[in-house]
From Swiss-Prot:
The lineage of its organism: Bacteria, Pseudomonadati, Pseudomonadota, Alphaproteobacteria, Hyphomicrobiales. It comes from Methylobacterium radiotolerans (strain ATCC 27329 / DSM 1819 / JCM 2831 / NBRC 15690 / NCIMB 10815 / 0-1). This is UPF0102 protein Mrad2831_2938. Belongs to the UPF0102 family. PANTHER family: UPF0102 PROTEIN YRAN. One of its GO terms (molecular function) is nucleic acid binding. SUPFAM superfamilies: Restriction endonuclease-like. Gene3D superfamilies: 3.40.1350.10. InterPro entries: Restrct_endonuc-II-like (IPR011335), tRNA_endonuc-like_dom_sf (IPR011856), UPF0102_YraN-like (IPR003509).
């Protein structure tokens, strides 16, 4: 049987590809600002961290949000997302003893179609640190 996938599957696949490209764009933007990548799509017991980067003695955990309009992406980080993100960060820190003396920060990069990624530092406080 051949043919196109159902509309829902097409939309999910397109959204996945858009999110994947957004993460690469976000990483490129951060590297241009002097951040060095440590991990991408890091899976830990608490969840997933889109990007982990480092600049000097600061380890930055980055949530990448991609929407058609960049301003819509800012609204996508709610309380539940913050709790899951914080849980994942704590699990990551527990597995990486080398960063014991580092400063930690939670940033976000918002990506929209045809717009340069917007990097927002300290988008929220990491719970439990």
């Amino acid at each position: 049987m051949t043919g196109a996938l159902p509309d829902g599957a097409d939309r999910r696949r397109a959204a996945y590809r858009f999110g994947h490209r957004a993460e690469w764009l976000a990483l490129a933007a951060l590297m241009l600002k002097g951040y060095w990548p440590i991990g991408r799509r890091v899976s830990v017991a608490g969840g997933e961290i889109d990007l982990v980067v480092r600049r000097w003695n600061t380890v930055v955990f980055v949530e990448v949000k991609a929407r058609a309009k960049r301003d819509d992406a800012r609204e996508a980080i709610d309380g539940a997302k913050r709790r899951r993100f914080s849980r994942a960060v704590r699990a990551w820190i527990g597995r990486n003893a080398w960063c014991a003396g580092a400063t930690f920060r939670a940033d976000a990069v918002f990506v929209g179609h045809w717009a340069w990624p917007a990097h927002v530092e300290r988008v929220f406080t990491i719970e439990g640190l």
